[in-house]
């Protein structure tokens, strides 16, 4: 049993709570949407979900700190810290696209040790904890243990991404397009879904040039517990780099080389 089994159990309870809010407000005619200072959208469901999760964590783990997308928090990454993205994929959420999820992770001295990704509109939930593997349920089915693919050549690989604009802003558009031209298949599954599909072995590479910690924390442990590799573009393990590359491990070094 994982050292963090009780924390994972709490994270799964948090996911249930989140689903009860987000799914109820999805496609609601009275959904309230506003713009944050960075001009990205935030809905009343984002705010209500993070508030509810913070309240439950504060009751269950009063000594733990919390960092969330909507209400901020401690960024020192010492001790035990919960990381929350109430709705990853808010732009999808507010347009009625079902590809969105609540992301919940526990960091121990900055390292993700437990994580849950819950996508109720897709009837899917993924989770992982240190040393206990990566798992997924679909439509309430029995949990299935996940393993990354064994694809060993880029020209046989499937790659998923979110957008091209970020690569251009990093002056890496040409390198990224060259990488995609090399791969067998390119799809824009986007956001959390790309990384979950890497963990499932359905996709071999996922990459983003600009992304926040709360977008990545549970995804990094999901991919690594499934046997994959998760780093920044600079090759640093974990979700703290501000960008991300996840692969089945076999393709990782070559992928990073192509993106330099």
Swiss-Prot record:
EC numbers for this chain: 3.1.3.15
Q: Which reaction does it catalyse?
A: L-histidinol phosphate + H2O = L-histidinol + phosphate
Cofactor(s) needed = Mg(2+)
Tell me yes or no: is Amino-acid biosynthesis among this UniProt entry's keywords.
yes
Instruction: Report disulfide bridges, numbered on this chain.
Output: none
Keywords, in A-Z order: Amino-acid biosynthesis, Histidine biosynthesis, Hydrolase, Magnesium, Metal-binding
Q: In which pathway does it act?
A: Amino-acid biosynthesis; L-histidine biosynthesis; L-histidine from 5-phospho-alpha-D-ribose 1-diphosphate: step 8/9
Keyword Hydrolase attributed? yes
Protein role: Catalyzes the dephosphorylation of histidinol-phosphate to histidinol, the direct precursor of histidine.
Q: What is this protein called?
A: Histidinol-phosphatase
The species this protein belongs to is Corynebacterium glutamicum (strain ATCC 13032 / DSM 20300 / JCM 1318 / BCRC 11384 / CCUG 27702 / LMG 3730 / NBRC 12168 / NCIMB 10025 / NRRL B-2784 / 534)
Question: Which gene codes for it?
Answer: hisN
């Amino acid at each position: 049993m994982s050292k963090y089994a009780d924390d994972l159990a709490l994270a799964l309870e948090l996911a249930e709570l989140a689903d009860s809010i987000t799914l109820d407000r999805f496609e609601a005619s009275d959904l309230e949407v506003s713009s944050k200072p960075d001009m990205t959208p935030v809905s009343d469901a984002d705010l209500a979900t993070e508030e509810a999760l913070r309240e439950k964590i504060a009751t269950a783990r009063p000594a733990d700190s919390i960092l969330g997308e909507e209400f901020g928090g401690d960024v020192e990454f010492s001790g035990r810290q919960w990381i929350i993205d109430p709705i990853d994929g808010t732009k999808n959420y507010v347009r009625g696209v079902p590809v969105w999820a609540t992301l919940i992770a526990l960091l121990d001295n900055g390292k993700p040790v437990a994580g849950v990704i819950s996508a109720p509109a897709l009837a899917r939930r993924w989770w992982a904890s240190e040393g206990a593997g990566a798992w997924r349920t679909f439509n309430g089915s029995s949990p299935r243990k996940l393993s990354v693919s064994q694809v060993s050549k880029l020209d046989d690989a499937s790659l998923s991404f979110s957008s091209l604009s970020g690569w251009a802003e990093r002056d890496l558009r040409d390198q990224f397009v060259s990488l995609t031209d090399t791969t067998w298949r390119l799809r824009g599954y986007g956001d959390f879904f790309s990384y979950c599909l890497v963990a499932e072995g359905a996709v071999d590479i996922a990459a983003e040039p600009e992304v926040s910690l709360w977008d990545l924390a549970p995804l990094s442990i999901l991919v690594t517990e499934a046997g994959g590799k998760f780093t920044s573009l600079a090759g640093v393990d974990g979700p703290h780099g501000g960008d991300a590359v996840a692969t089945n491990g076999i393709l990782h070094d070559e992928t990073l080389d192509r993106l330099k």
